[in-house]
């Protein structure tokens, strides 16, 4: 069943990307236009003798209107080619300043184009005599902190067929790669990783370390649809002393809980790194502390299964995950409001009210939908129908109203499109599950 859903999602991805493409806007007399990336190949080179790293991105994209194509890279490119010609880029803010992005500094007609960008890789990387530690860990709480933090990428609405070609130049020891893609070893120091076409800039888990730097256990989990799903749980020997047996046991229990509630696990593998305080989710993978493991694996269904298309939809999965963490409690009344659904148009971050007020809002919806079995039947329906399909909040509302036969539009407008500063003080969010870690903290978990 999951295989059929995956193919259906892939067939729909191109049109879905176009329907969720952000609107163009003017900046300094130039029309910034968003593109649909169809494929991106990233050549990631780690030069261990020079202790430097770089990424060369080769991207095929399509624009539907003339203008200056948008992409993003936090790190300034050292070289950019657009349709084979050397160009520069412009770093610019959206009209109301909610986010920053890059433009190709060349007017382009609507249609297919190629974009080649080279950037140095400097974030979350550590060289030593043993090899290199490097990770592309992300956050939905900080601005420009998905894949664009490390290499050129698109906004989260876009599903892209991505490939990594990873080279360890001058490596004396074997490198281990933990990732949620398919790895092929081209030679002793070169690997090609292929990721599914439904992945977005928030989907990829990538972590490489010298062999022997981690403790790990590999095993398989039997899905209710008959698949044997490969799983690995691990932690760094230098930063964490935990129990692989306990980590495996808890991963297994949560896996079966989630399959019982929401159907077959949507992804082909599971990767769990026990590290940090709180956690972050990826498609079938997580970097998490032990206590947040259930929250993060839930996100393989909602966030990295049923996917938000923008920041204003990002609160939904966090509210649902937090509602699960709290035992799916039902409440009949709700005080206050929030602005979780109504931030500025180009917002990319998640409103942290999701962890508190959003959780309570889901409990309120569960009460309202009791005649239809509550909220969970709708959640399973969304996994069945919308897996790997980015959505806007408005689409989520429509799906809920259609499935249940109960209009919830007025409830969302009242409780998630408000001023954002009038919900109860004791519900002000402190997202311990996704606590913001500093770069130094994350560096410690490499």
Regions from the PLM with identified roles:
Residues 216-313:
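Juxtacatalytic substrate-recognition/specificity segment
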Residues 6, 12-53, 429-437:
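N-terminal, polar/Ser/Thr-rich
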Residues 152, 283-292, 312-348:
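Post-HExxH zinc-binding segment in Zn-dependent metallohydrolases
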Residues 74-136, 190:
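A surface-exposed beta-strand-loop module
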Residues 57, 69, 106, 155, ...:
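Zn2+-dependent metallopeptidase catalytic core
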Residues 354, 359-434:
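Amphipathic alpha-helical substructures
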Residues 20-22, 66-88, 159-176:
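Solvent-exposed beta-hairpin/edge-strand motifs
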Residues 50, 58-62, 107, 116-211:
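Extended, low-hydrophobicity, Ser/Thr/Pro/Gly-biased non-transmembrane segments
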């Amino acid at each position: 069943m999951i295989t059929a859903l995956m193919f259906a999602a892939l067939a729909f991805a191109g049109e879905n990307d176009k329907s969720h493409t952000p609107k163009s806007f003017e900046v300094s007399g130039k029309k910034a236009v968003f593109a649909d990336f169809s494929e991106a190949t990233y050549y990631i080179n780690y030069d261990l003798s020079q202790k430097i790293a770089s990424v060369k991105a080769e991207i095929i994209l399509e624009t539907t209107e003339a203008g200056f194509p948008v992409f993003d890279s936090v790190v300034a490119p050292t070289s950019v080619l657009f349709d084979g010609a050397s160009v520069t880029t412009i770093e610019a803010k959206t009209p109301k300043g909610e986010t920053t992005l890059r433009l190709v500094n060349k007017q382009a007609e609507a249609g297919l184009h190629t974009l080649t960008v080279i950037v140095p890789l400097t974030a979350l990387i550590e060289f030593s005599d043993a090899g290199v530690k490097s990770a592309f860990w992300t956050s939905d709480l900080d601005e420009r902190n998905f894949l664009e933090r490390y290499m050129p990428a698109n906004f989260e609405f876009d599903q892209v067929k991505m490939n990594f070609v990873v080279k360890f130049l001058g490596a004396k020891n074997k490198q281990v790669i933990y990732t949620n893609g398919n790895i092929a070893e081209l030679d002793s120091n070169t690997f090609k990783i292929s990721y599914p076409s439904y992945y977005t800039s928030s989907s990829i888990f990538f972590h490489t370390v010298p062999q022997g730097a981690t403790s790990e256990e590999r095993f398989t989990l039997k899905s209710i649809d008959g698949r044997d799903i490969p799983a690995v749980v691990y932690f760094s020997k230098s930063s964490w002393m935990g129990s692989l047996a306990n980590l495996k046991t808890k991963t297994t229990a949560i896996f079966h809980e989630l399959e019982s509630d929401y159907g077959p696990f949507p992804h082909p593998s599971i990767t769990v790194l026990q590290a940090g305080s709180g956690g972050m989710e990826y498609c079938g993978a997580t970097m998490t502390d032990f206590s947040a493991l259930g929250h993060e694996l839930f996100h393989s269904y909602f966030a990295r299964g049923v996917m938000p298309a923008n920041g204003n939809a990002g609160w939904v999965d966090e509210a649902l995950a937090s509602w699960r963490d709290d035992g799916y409690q039902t409440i009949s009344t709700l005080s206050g409001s929030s602005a979780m659904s109504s931030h500025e148009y180009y917002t990319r971050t998640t409103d942290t009210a999701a962890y508190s007020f959003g959780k309570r809002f889901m409990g309120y919806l569960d009460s309202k939908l009791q005649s239809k079995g509550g909220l969970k039947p709708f959640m399973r329906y969304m996994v069945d129908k919308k897996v790997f399909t980015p959505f806007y909040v408005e689409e989520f509302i429509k799906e809920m109203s259609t499935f249940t036969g109960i209009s919830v539009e007025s409830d969302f407008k009242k409780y998630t499109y408000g001023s954002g500063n009038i919900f109860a003080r004791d519900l002000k969010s402190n997202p311990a599950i996704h606590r913001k870690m500093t770069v130094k903290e994350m560096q410690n978990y490499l």
